[in-house]
Amino acid sequence: MRQKGWGRIINFSSSAGKNISTVGGAHYTAAKAGILGFTRHLASEEAKYGITVNAVCPGLINTEMVKNTINDDDIKKYANSFPIKRLGKASEVASLVLFLSSDEAEYITGASLDINGGDLMI
């Protein structure tokens, strides 16, 4: 990436990295917060090489992991507490990653982008 003068690094954190985890413990929250610090630091080092570094912070996304970790009643409770009233879709996270990977995102670096149905607003 440095040789080409262009690159995109996209790290995955979580809403838990900015708040607390609804299903993970303190270790999960600490790890996800660490990814955010790493992202900012690496972004400051790599920007001069044309490399952007960002983090995607999903909330509850409708995945097998969520279905296997949280019971259906709690999933409904969480979804209804979000302003958008549903869990996110993996395709929505993929669309954000695709954008961050593109030339159109060349001025975005060191950012942590929430994709959580408005959960962190409340």
List the predicted regions and their residue ranges.
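Active-site loop immediately N-terminal to the catalytic Tyr-X3-Lys motif
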Residues: 19-26, 48-49, 85, 103
